[in-house]
Regions:
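Structural motif corresponding to the early beta-alpha repeats
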Residues: 1-2, 26
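Short, well-ordered amphipathic alpha-helical segments that serve as non-catalytic structural scaffolds
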Residues: 2-12
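Active-site groove signature of glycoside hydrolases
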Residues: 12-32
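Beta/alpha (TIM)-barrel catalytic core signal, keyed to glycine-rich beta->alpha loops juxtaposed to Asp/Glu
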Residues: 26-202
């Protein structure tokens, strides 16, 4: 609890702010969350006006516990075409929680013709190969972004880039709207066939 409070105070000092809109606990294990003392600290910070909303960033069982606890108003979690555990098993349990999807383009594994051993995209590359999907006439980035941004329960997504042109293309792709139902059905069939037991990447 002390480190959480210090993190809040440091953030306030660094941003020269009186209040942090959303403060996230990152990747906190379920057994720690179950004690409840970290949430108590966040509740006190909300009551004191130091933060607006207490959030949790994580995946799998700890995320499910955080959502079910009812003590967080926002979550940040992995959601993409190759990482659907959180989407299928957690999102939508509590409609009042704000959801930020991280890794919305799955670390762009389509950049690699062969397995990118040791690269952060390696797991998602393996999963895309197993899913045997094609981009349905779109660029992979468009398919991935539209899948994530318009997924049920997702309110926004974080995608990083160092190039302004890539940012503009990402915005344009998201603005194309949800994927066609036929495309979503094929993705769903592929996931159910080989990916149903895949946990979220942490």
């Amino acid at each position: 609890p002390g480190s959480v409070l210090e993190g809040i105070e440091q953030s306030l000092r660094r941003t020269r702010s009186e209040k942090i809109d959303v403060f996230y606990l990152h990747s906190c294990p379920a057994d720690i969350l179950q004690r409840g003392d970290l949430q108590d600290t966040l509740d006190r910070a909300v009551a004191a006006g130091k933060i607006g909303v207490a959030g949790y960033s994580g995946d799998n069982a700890p995320l499910a516990f955080a959502v079910d606890s009812g003590r967080f108003g926002a979550i940040e979690t992995s959601v993409n075409i190759a990482d659907q555990w959180n989407l299928r098993n957690v999102l939508g349990r509590r409609s009042e929680i704000g959801v930020i999807a991280k890794r919305p383009i799955a670390n762009a594994p389509w950049r690699f013709a062969e397995r990118p051993a040791g690269n952060y995209a390696e797991l998602y590359w393996e999963r895309l190969q197993a899913l045997e999907l094609d981009p349905f006439g779109m660029e992979w980035a468009e398919l991935a972004l539209r899948f994530t941004v318009h997924a049920p329960g997702v309110h926004t997504a974080i995608t990083g880039t160092a190039k302004l042109d890539h940012l503009r293309r990402n915005i344009a792709a998201a603005n194309c709207g949800p994927l066609p139902a036929t495309v979503l059905e094929r993705i769903d069939r592929a996931w159910r066939a080989v990916g149903a037991d895949w946990p979220a990447s942490t």
